[in-house]
């Protein structure tokens, strides 16, 4: 059970929450702050003060005063009208993350909701009732209005949820769990939907997958180094320490550890003086992608613990301030950066694939074919990888440089952060498939070189891979092989924990 405080949630805890189904509880001190802040909102309503989103309309309607008797209707209408999401739903892990992050931000005690609302969010998390939230429709400011409205709907007993492996009406799950839908009161609808939790939850899942995929890329690249009898000197610690980037040093160190007892690597001058960049520069390129990941992790952990709704309530109600913390620009930039960093892992992987299959670049059978000419072997697998790499270049176009005004130009600059976050996740899926092609080719090359000559780590990795796909002895439908390795990498070389190279032993 992980305790939410509004201030201390980490990526490591989110791994447990999203991927292992761990439960959550609220810090009592934080819940007390929630209750105290709620008293301020109720006094504002009672006194008839004019405060945005509590006693006024929203967006361009912020100058419309709402009567006390209509305050509840205002919040319900807000959720109904803003539930304009379209397209396929987010992965269930993302909608679970949205519930967790929305509860965590409310526990900062500046949003003005009742403790009941926070408790309801936590009940959904712990009972694994996850909102069906369409992926498209958010501008990323005022936050993720459309996606979060679909989240809010299910608290009211409306909309759909994922529950016990099925997609059902929210009331089906609530009834089975013995829960009553809530009725929103002043400020609560706005507090639920005005924030960045859709882009951030998707960003967190993308980061977790990207981290695991990056470790996997090092193992797979190490197998390719063996298949091409790569020069190990290029990974010498002295080379990388003189550059000064810790991530580069760490990648080189891990590859040295993976290959420390390999009989397939060579010394410079033994077969050739230098390797091509796609081998020799693995630490520099992969290390730079790790720099991106470290940046993204830092920004996500800030946003996971941020108050991103509007208005915010401070000093016991002395200050009720309309600001712009819902603007998703920091996450939009981070997700666009993640897109570039991960796309580059596929770029260099595809070039290593080419070196494995091109007979002009190695002494292996052409296209790793068991019968060159009669059988094409891995020829078209390289095409598939090249296609994914090209697709990634399109997806990597920065969403954050775009902005379209909305709400009659009141909201005249937006982040498009949710688009960036979604595209980052798509890129990561493509990267995993490119790496799967590289692994298939590297395993085949290892068989020509002699499996007994592989390092202890890569040999173990090879044998586990061969449990997923057989050796290429004849042409067959290779799309199945690619998907099998892709699924295995995602579920077993898992996104649940950081890949330690020793885990392959």
Swiss-Prot record:
One of its GO terms (molecular function) is histidine ammonia-lyase activity. Contains an active site 4-methylidene-imidazol-5-one (MIO), which is formed autocatalytically by cyclization and dehydration of residues Ala-Ser-Gly. Keywords: Cytoplasm, Histidine metabolism, Lyase. It is an enzyme of class 4 (lyase). GO terms for biological process: L-histidine catabolic process to glutamate and formamide; L-histidine catabolic process to glutamate and formate. GO terms for cellular component: cytoplasm. Gene3D superfamilies: Fumarase/aspartase (Central domain), Fumarase/aspartase (N-terminal domain). Its main location: cytoplasm. It is found in: Cytoplasm. SUPFAM superfamilies: L-aspartase-like (SSF48557). Its EC number is 4.3.1.3. The modification 2,3-didehydroalanine (Ser) is found at residue 142. Pfam families: Lyase_aromatic. It catalyses: L-histidine = trans-urocanate + NH4(+). There is a cross-link at residues 141-143 (5-imidazolinone (Ala-Gly)). Pathway: Amino-acid degradation; L-histidine degradation into L-glutamate; N-formimidoyl-L-glutamate from L-histidine: step 1/3. NCBIfam families: hutH, PRK09367.1. Belongs to the PAL/histidase family. This is Histidine ammonia-lyase.
């Amino acid at each position: 059970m992980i305790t939410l405080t509004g201030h201390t949630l980490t990526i490591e805890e989110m791994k447990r929450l999203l991927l292992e189904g761990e439960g959550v509880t609220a810090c009592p001190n934080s819940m007390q702050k929630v209750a105290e802040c709620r008293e301020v909102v109720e006094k504002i309503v009672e006194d008839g003060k004019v405060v945005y989103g509590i006693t006024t309309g929203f967006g361009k309607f912020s100058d419309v005063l709402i009567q006390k008797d209509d305050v509840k209707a205002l919040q319900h209408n807000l959720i109904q009208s803003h539930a304009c999401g379209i397209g396929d739903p987010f992965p269930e892990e993302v909608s679970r993350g949205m519930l967790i992050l929305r509860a965590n931000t409310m526990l900062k005690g500046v949003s003005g909701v009742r403790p009941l609302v926070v408790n309801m969010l936590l009940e959904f998390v712990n009972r694994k009732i996850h909102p069906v939230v369409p992926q498209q429709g958010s501008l990323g400011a005022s936050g993720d209005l459309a996606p979060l409205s679909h989240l809010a709907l299910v608290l009211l007993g409306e909309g759909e949820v994922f529950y016990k492996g099925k997609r059902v009406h929210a009331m089906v799950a609530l009834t089975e769990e013995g829960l009553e839908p809530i009725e929103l009161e002043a400020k609560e609808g706005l507090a639920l939907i005005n924030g960045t939790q859709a882009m951030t939850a998707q960003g967190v899942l993308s980061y977790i997958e990207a981290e695991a995929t990056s470790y996997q890329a090092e193992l797979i690249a190490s197998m390719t180094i063996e298949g091409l009898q790569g020069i190990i000197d290029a990974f010498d610690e002295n080379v990388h320490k003189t550059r000064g980037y810790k991530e580069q040093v760490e990648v080189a160190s891990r590859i040295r550890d993976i290959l420390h007892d390999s009989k397939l690597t060579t010394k410079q001058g033994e077969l050739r003086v230098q390797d091509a960049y796609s081998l020799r520069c693995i630490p520099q390129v992969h290390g730079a992608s790790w720099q991106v990941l470290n940046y993204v992790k830092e920004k996500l952990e800030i946003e996971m613990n941020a108050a991103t709704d509007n208005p915010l309530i401070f000093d016991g109600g002395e200050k009720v301030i309309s600001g712009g913390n819902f603007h998703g620009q920091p996450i939009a930039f981070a997700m666009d950066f993640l897109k570039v960093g991960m796309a580059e892992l596929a770029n260099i992987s595809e070039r290593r694939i080419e070196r494995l299959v091109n007979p002009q670049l190695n002494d292996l059978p052409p296209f790793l074919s068991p019968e060159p000419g009669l059988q094409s072997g891995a020829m078209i697998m390289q095409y598939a990888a090249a296609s994914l790499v090209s697709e990634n270049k399109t997806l990597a176009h920065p969403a954050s440089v775009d902005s379209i005004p909305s709400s009659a130009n009141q909201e005249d600059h937006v982040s498009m952060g949710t688009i960036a976050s979604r595209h980052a996740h798509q890129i990561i899926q493509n990267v995993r498939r490119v790496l799967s092609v590289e692994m298939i080719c590297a395993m085949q090359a290892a068989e020509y070189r002699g499996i007994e000559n592989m390092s202890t780590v890569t040999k173990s990795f090879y044998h586990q891979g061969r449990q997923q796909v057989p050796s290429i002895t004849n042409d067959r439908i290779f799309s199945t092989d690619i998907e099998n390795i892709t699924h295995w990498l995602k579920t077993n070389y898992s996104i649940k924990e950081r890949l330690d190279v020793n885990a392959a032993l």
